[in-house]
């Protein structure tokens, strides 16, 4: 077993001098962890879908406290408000097994492991395992992108593949803390659109990029699977304080994730899928201007009047930024976007 260094990327704000709110959150988590362990809870690992390329893989998982003997499936079914009251385990060692090679990594202050490791895996889907010293072994799917692939899909989640009410506070709280995946509604035609895109572009990676918290990852994964969306990695964030602010910026999370994908896969041109409620047009436009060779097109789902009100209005941008090299398509549903993408030669 080899020891890997902690990633230079700092997804949970583990700076040397954390913000006052982050220090208070750490103390609160430590208090809750001590109480939970007195009740007999032990660590369990919730594994998320990872991705990579020949030579490396990005591993994503989270360590929480659960009853001894709780299976990974049972832990994943914690939903609604309970997912946000679960106790994370920070700074715990996690063993990652990739093709028989084991490495030790460390969870961040939110219990999240987000690390890139060397791996000798061929293109396609693979299974790795993750565990702590006291937990059962958990499996995680990872998708290794073929170096010859030149097309990929990045899709927003809220109001793009799933009808939500974010960010209106009361409805956002209801959707996040109460509803499970059975009560969430898919956007008409979007699952078919993404499935057609993956058939038209074999081997294309699919990334679901959201400002949602890691707590809801199991619920979102079950929703996407139940609605027959293509399998892919979820890139979520931590809603808590960071080393320099009270709350993490969702927009910065999306911008940084897109820039990272452009660096990790310089040969891929991404189809960016989002909606016109708030910031997707602005975020995608900025990325297309900064990385024109990394964008094949931008597909924007147009919200209905009622959805736009619930989402806090439409984008304030005076139309999407028009990069000379980027095609933009707009439609209210997946079928309309598919028709326009077909005309553009992407379907």
Question: For each predicted feature, which ranges?
Answer:
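Intrinsically disordered, serine/threonine/proline
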Residues: 1-141, 145, 334-336, 341-347
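Short, acidic loop-to-helix structural element flanking the phosphoryl-transfer center
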Residues: 180-204, 214-218, 256
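C-terminal cap/substrate-recognition subdomain and adjoining C-terminal extension
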Residues: 2-15, 212-347
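Asp-based phosphoryl-transfer active-site loop
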Residues: 151-166, 284
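Short, surface-exposed connector motifs at secondary-structure boundaries
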Residues: 199-207, 263-270
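Short, flexible helix-coil linker/hinge segments at the edges of structured domains or between repeats
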Residues: 161-185
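Short beta-strand elements
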Residues: 136-151, 157, 171
């Amino acid at each position: 077993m080899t020891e890997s260094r902690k990633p230079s990327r700092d997804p949970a704000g583990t700076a040397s001098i954390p913000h006052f709110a982050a220090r208070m959150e750490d103390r609160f988590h430590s208090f809750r962890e001590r109480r939970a362990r007195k009740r007999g809870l032990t660590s369990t690992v919730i594994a998320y879908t990872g991705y990579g390329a020949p030579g490396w893989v990005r591993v994503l998982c989270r360590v929480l406290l659960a009853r001894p003997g709780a299976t990974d499936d049972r832990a994943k079914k914690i939903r609604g408000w309970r997912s946000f009251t679960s106790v994370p385990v920070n700074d715990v060692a996690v063993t990652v097994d990739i093709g028989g090679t084991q490495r030790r990594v460390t969870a961040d202050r939110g219990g999240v492991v987000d690390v890139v490791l060397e791996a000798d895996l061929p293109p396609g889907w693979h299974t790795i395992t993750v565990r702590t010293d006291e937990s059962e072994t958990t499996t995680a799917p990872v998708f290794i992108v073929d170096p010859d692939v030149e097309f990929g899909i990045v899709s927003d989640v809220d109001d793009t593949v799933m009808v939500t009410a974010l960010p209106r506070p009361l409805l956002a709280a209801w959707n996040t803390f109460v509803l499970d995946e059975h009560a969430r509604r898919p956007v008409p035609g979007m699952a078919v659109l993404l499935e057609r895109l993956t058939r038209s572009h074999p081997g294309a990676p699919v990334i679901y990029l959201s400002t949602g918290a890691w707590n809801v990852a199991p619920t979102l994964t079950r929703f996407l699977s139940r609605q027959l969306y293509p399998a892919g990695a979820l890139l979520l964030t931590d809603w808590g304080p960071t080393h320099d602010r009270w709350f993490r910026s969702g927009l910065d999370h999306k911008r940084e994730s897109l820039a990272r994908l452009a660096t990790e896969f310089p040969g891929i041109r991404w189809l960016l899928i989002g909606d016109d409620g708030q910031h997707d047009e602005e975020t995608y436009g900025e990325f297309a201007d900064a990385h024109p060779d990394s964008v094949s097109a931008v597909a924007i789902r147009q919200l209905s009047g009622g959805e736009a009100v619930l989402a806090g209005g439409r984008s304030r941008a005076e139309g999407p930024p028009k990069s000379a090299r980027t095609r933009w398509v707009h439609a209210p549903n997946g079928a309309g976007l598919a028709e326009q993408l077909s005309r553009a030669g992407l379907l």
